[in-house]
Amino acid sequence: MPESQIIELGTLGQIPLYSLERALQDPLRAVKLRRQIVSQHQATGNIDFTTDGSALPYEGYDYKAVLGACCENVIGYMPIPVGVAGPIKINGKMVFLPMSTTEGALVASTNRGCMAINAGGGVTALVLGDGMTRAPIVRFPSLEEAGAAKQWLGSDAGFLIIEDAFNASSRFARLQNIKATAVGSDLYIRFTASTGDAMGMNMISKGVEQALEAMQKHGFESMDVVSLSGNFCADKKPAAVNWIEGRGKTVTAQATIPEHAVRETLKTSVEALVELNVSKNLVGSAVAGALGGFNAHAANVVTAIYLATGQDPAQNVQSSNTLTVMKNVNGDLQISVFMPSIEVGTVGGGTVLGPQKAMLHMMGVQGADPEQPGRNAQELALLVAAGVLAGELSLCSALSAGSLVKSHLTHNRKKG
């Protein structure tokens, strides 16, 4: 079929946009024709828009990697600037942090934080917990049956049955614990499992399906699955359960900044930083009723690293849960962050794309760790926490010194 006919039929809605790759067996050609269809469609006809005349690029991209994994109805790709902060010394290693952002001053500020941290010997960071969660809703005919199911899930015998079924779903998924809450005759069951180097949402969802099937075969035939996700997980929304129980990687990171580095590099004082952190990040956040937001701008750094490394950017909602603490220790500044729900992976999702894969490689965490599954994803979580630590340190320093507006005018505004 001639391209002109494909475009005409697509414009009229007789060929679905999503079917072009399958019909043409050529991802790049499908993207090119879809751009033409969008340009000639009545939805764009009255705004003088053409994809070919736009600044949205489409050539020179690996659409085979995108197909069936990352995006649908593709018409191009969105270039976002990528900068590097650092290198920063973390657990004895020097690492550059890639950050993809359009916010001027963010990379420069984080880089300044890295310099100050290195002056004190670097960051020490630990993974305190590692478990992705999924929480389905199941429904029973009566409250009594829901209560019996909750009790069974909490028993050793019940857990073993569920564990066997869950673990059989994957080489890497390993069930850690189950937490069930009954609301009337509905039961919300929060499964927590390790998922290797994958972020793990698909993996754990598959395991949960098999676990629920096993449950129905062991005395709970009347149980109906309302939804595989019941928001008790909780994914991509603020939730106290993630702050308290953790989700993904639970991480803490700490550094000591010598007084001279605070004064010379950060242009402030230890006393001013400690006071500002209490007034802003602790008291101010409490006044706001913040949930997981006891920090200055953790989400800025988390999202920038996520975009650069192929993570799910929507998961910055819970991944940015951060408590920032600053103390005066013998005249020097001790700064730490606690991040209970960093959700990252080094395989799957956007990590299959070439540019994102390259940034993971630069950080030394690309792909699956062949010797210790999960180690690369844990290392990435530590690097995210180190970046957040640097970002918190620098922004709070700018606020305490009154230089925030000046720095943004320097890096975020073009003259003329």
Curated annotation (Swiss-Prot):
Its main location: membrane. Pathway: Metabolic intermediate biosynthesis; (R)-mevalonate biosynthesis; (R)-mevalonate from acetyl-CoA: step 3/3. It catalyses: (R)-mevalonate + 2 NADP(+) + CoA = (3S)-3-hydroxy-3-methylglutaryl-CoA + 2 NADPH + 2 H(+). Induction: Expression is positively regulated by the cluster-specific transcription factor pbcR. GO terms for biological process: coenzyme A metabolic process; ergosterol biosynthetic process; isoprenoid biosynthetic process; secondary metabolic process. The chain crosses the membrane at residues 380-400. The active site is at E103, K236, D312, H408. PROSITE patterns: HMG_COA_REDUCTASE_1, HMG_COA_REDUCTASE_2, HMG_COA_REDUCTASE_3, HMG_COA_REDUCTASE_4. It is an enzyme of class 1 (oxidoreductase). Disulfide bonds: none annotated. 3-hydroxy-3-methylglutaryl coenzyme A reductase; part of the gene cluster that mediates the biosynthesis of the diterpene ent-pimara-8(14),15-diene (PD). Within the cluster, the HMG-CoA reductase AN1593 functions in the mevalonate pathway, which produces isoprenoid precursors. The geranylgeranyl pyrophosphate (GGPP) synthase AN1592 is needed in the formation of GGPP, the precursor for diterpenes. Lastly, the pimaradiene synthase pbcA performs the 2 cyclization steps that convert GGPP to ent-pimara-8(14),15-diene. This is 3-hydroxy-3-methylglutaryl coenzyme A reductase AN1593. It comes from Emericella nidulans (strain FGSC A4 / ATCC 38163 / CBS 112.46 / NRRL 194 / M139) (Aspergillus nidulans).
